């Protein structure tokens, strides 16, 4: 799933009402997704808005194995604060470190969106044993920018994904 898939990407504005979208991880979404993972024998990587406690929120990805078992979570470490991406208003940087999850099909590493611009994140995760890197992402065309600038940013995004694969000898999956 793409980044924060249970709603539209809400970080394009600073709105306290959006904190109502947060949930515990594991929690209701992971319970439902565990049933689906087991039913379809697939690994599910789900990006969620995590409420850790009152006033402490994370951009978190949960990993559920093909047997429905919750394997754990990764919390986004690099939090942007750019026009249209006001994530520092919502999220605290992750505190779980870079992790590798041993699934039925492969050892996978999870990094989230803005983490992609920091090559050490991909490197550390692959050195820890990841065979595939997954990047749940929410990057789009900025309506206030001209087409040429949007295209340049899109090309940079494509290039950074490819470079992680080549430099680290792994597959990279970016879900946007």
Regions found by a protein language model. Give the residues of each.
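Metal-dependent catalytic neighborhoods of phosphoester/phosphodiester hydrolases
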Residues: 5-25, 53-57
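CN hydrolase (nitrilase-like) catalytic-core segments centered on the catalytic cysteine
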Residues: 25-45, 113-176
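Short, acidic, Ser/Thr-enriched surface-loop or helix-capping motifs
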Residues: 65-66
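Short clusters of small/polar residues that mark proteolytic maturation junctions
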Residues: 75, 112-113
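A short, polar/charged loop-to-alpha-helix boundary motif
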Residues: 76-90
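Beta-strand-turn-beta hairpins that frame and shape the catalytic cleft
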Residues: 100-109, 131-132
